[in-house]
Amino acid sequence: MKIHHFLTLLCTFLPLTTTALTNSTPLSLLGPCYKRCVTKFGETKEQLTNAETISLEYDVSNNTEFSLCKLGCNSHEYTDLNLAAFRYGQLAYQKILTTVEDVPTRGTVLNDVFIVCLDTSFMPSNNSAPSAKRLLSGTVLLVLDEDVAKADNVFLIEVLARNADKSAVQVISQQWCYSSNCNITFNAPTEVSSFDVRLRVSTFDSNGQVGGINFSKWHNINQILTKTFVDMSLKSVVWKAEKAAANFVFNLTASDHVPACSLQMIYRSSLSSELLHRNFYLDHTLEVFVNNLDFDKIYTMQLAPSGTHDRSTPSLASAVIEIPPCRHLVDDYSMCAPPPVSSLSYNWNLSPTSEYELLIKWKLLNYMDGLNVTEELSIPVAYFLLNAHPLITANNEQCEKYEKIRRVVSYGLRELVFHVPDTDCNYEVEMTAVDTNQRISEVKKIQVFRFNVPPYVSFLQASDIPTSVELMAVVLATSAIFALIALFLLYRKRKRDKKARFQMYKDAEAGVSYDYVATTESLGSVVQIRSTNFRFEPVENIDGNIEAALAQQQKFEGGTMNSMFRTYYNLDHPVKVPAHMAEASSDEDNGYENIRYSYFGSELSDDVFEEDIYMTHKSLSIYCQDSPLTTPMAPIAPYEHFDDIPSHQYRNFQVHNFNERIEKQAYWLMATVVDVVRRELYSLKVPKDYTPETISAMRKELEFLRTLAPHGNCRRFEGVVIGRWDDLPRQVIGILIENTRGGTLRNYIAAVGSVFRNCSLATDHDSFASQQDMNSTQHPFDKLSTEADENNSKKVKIQEITDSLSIRFCQFAEQVSSALEHLHSAGSVHTRVTTLNIYLLHNYSDPFDMLPDQVVKLGNFGFAVQNSEDVVLDDNLQPPEVIKGEKYEARGDIWQFGLCLAEMCSLGDLEQSEVGTLKSGHDTFKNLPSTQVLRDAAKRCLSARTRPSASDLCGVFKSVNVAATV
């Protein structure tokens, strides 16, 4: 019989649907018909709300009879389906159509309409829906008039939408609601950036439409998707099930933001580091209870989207609440744990026969406005629990070996005598009260010392005084030795500084300066001289025949390495060495090496050897050494396994000392090398040790680089370096990479950020090069100076510099996006997209005056993979989905790129930037339109739900750069 009934419904579905579509039923008749179906077939069920109240709602889900009744309302002319519920719907429609009841129409039913919350999910494109859409689902709250019952009406909820120009409004969704709160679902296209929605609600009773039409306010789709703010406040704290419960309320009228429906409360007490979570779905009560809180504690509450487990994720709302003691929340003290014992004291029994007895006394007093009074407690206490712990005691090693003493004491007693294993030990006694419900009071502690003597006497007996004097003498002697060592180190430092200052004056008198030299190409001509104290010296002031001596390179903390030369120039007035500095100093003491000691060819004598930026080990010499025929470096693989890759002999390179890279899980060393045959600079990457893990990692990177197609914004793979290792010829011992002389993007950001935040990096007296003109007040980085230049031709404003810098960052962002697009299109992920792995191709001396063809390149493919199962991630670079246990995909690279964009927006000062409100170090830079584009892109990349692709970001930044060039 059931199978026959199912086949009957299935056979009648198609013609019935066709009839319903061809015969459109007016809403004025359909609404009251649905109301009668709900009254007839709907089931009333009790639902527990977030406010822990009972709500009576009509439940029509999975209700076949109600569905048939609705079908009868829509198909009032169809006669082939003879089911009672279907016929009831048809008869209800006919009665509404033919009967006009004399019932007064109600003027007001709804006072307001709210979108309580919305959750978003992504619907990918398919054959039926060529464009991707966002599915939004949430809760709607209908505020009824005071004397309107919840079950008196049904509601038609329509979702209206409009574009940015607000010229046309269309209905994108219609849904029926049978209660004052219900769920809605509608779609929003992903390609629309500015999209507003609102609700239109029509009300019906069993006779027709009532109360007019109500509207909610307009909400922008971007504000809905960001969900950055929720107005949350504490409503009350109550006693609940032996614990405290905090009731929070959310105010929708105070903000235009629409929160997510799936939320969680992340909280912890001030005395604990454990994070607790309370997941909930926001309902029409706009409240939530957080239960199982401890009394008399302070809690930090954070509201976040559901599924968030990272402390660094920005919260939608936060609050710090103080839970009062239990007795402040109840009228009956028997509902609380007993108060702690008071007047806890001890005495030793000094009788010769009872030397090991200890007497403990205590009282239990009542509450009175938070203070103890002399009245004994009237609430039922079952017993007292006493614990005595032996303490570590001087001159008695046995004390710490004794077991803890535990006694259960009847409630009627207020003192206890018990034996201890050793009276020469000190003890800590703990006392708690336990009531009939096994609730334990706070612990009261007291320390017990031998024979009631002061604590220090029990630890320092008369026989120990000589030992203590000796110990004090040792401590004083050790302190004196450390003080002498500190004074000696300070003296040596001051002596070195004095020598350096003397050499400065001596060289200044001779017309010598130690400068950073910037060139157009790796072997090109000198275009600018920047001395060590960041002062600029025009090239015209330098002797045309520059005699350069390669100096020991300066290593900055996380900074770039620029080559330093000793340059000679003509001084109009010789500089005298101060009298107090007039002492002998030889050239051997200045710490600089002469370049003639490292000549390997006349054409390369003035070339700049720039080490890789990730250097940690200081080297006393940077002589360029000839490579031997046999290399001590670990072989990666035989060359016949990679014979399709260009190879270069190791003996053809001049190699600097290898230096270790500052990065977790790095398996390689880096050095800058010179190919003496081709006269070009390269970066060489070699294994750092001989372990199988290192060799496997290097071989894995080589496999990746051989399949990666070249790209203009990826650091170019130049081939492999081969050599003999032991008795094995033609072994791959290193990976040759394009040399990038400009250092990392992080160093560039730090350089411009420090200028913006500090305005000046040096004072006038810091530079001996500026002594040609003692009245010069030139600031570091001339482009930021508001003074006129030497010819007073024009004034360069800060606004122009910040415009240029912001556009430069957008250009860099476009180039990195293009590199990521290239990687992702090949099915690969980088996994280390940071500003430390983005390199500037050309060198620069002034970060505000770089070459126009400056580009950035993405490098360090040591952890790049094509299979997401093989990803090895840095703990600090894990996107939210990976923390939740999902696979690392291309969107993880986008999240890391968002951190790079945030670093650009904040000019490297990430400690003062907040996710969602990224701030730069300079107001002018922060308020630029191009900086706003960077900031918006960073927010989109750091979203936990939806992120743009690399191609989308590339298009965004390209449009900004094209507009800047027009």
Swiss-Prot record:
User: Topology: which residues are Extracellular?
Assistant: 20-470
Q: Does the keyword Protein transport apply?
A: no
Tell me the compartments it is located in: Cell membrane
Sites of glycosylation?
A: 62, 126, 183, 214, 251, 372
Q: What is its main location?
A: membrane
Give the membrane topology, semicolon-separated if more than one.
Single-pass type I membrane protein
> What is the annotated signal peptide range for this record?
1-19
Q: Which residues form a coiled coil?
A: none
Alphabetized, the UniProt keywords read: ATP-binding, Cell cycle, Cell division, Cell membrane, Glycoprotein, Membrane, Mitosis, Nucleotide-binding, Signal, Transmembrane, Transmembrane helix
Primary role? During early embryogenesis, controls asymmetric cell division and the asymmetric localization of P granules of germline precursor P2 and its descendant P3. Probably upstream of tyrosine kinase src-1, plays a role in endoderm development by controlling spindle orientation during EMS blastomere cell division. Controls EMS spindle orientation probably by promoting lin-5 and gpr-1/2 enrichment at, and let-99 exclusion from the junction between P2 and EMS cells.
Recorded protein name is Protein mes-1
What organism is recorded for this protein? Caenorhabditis elegans
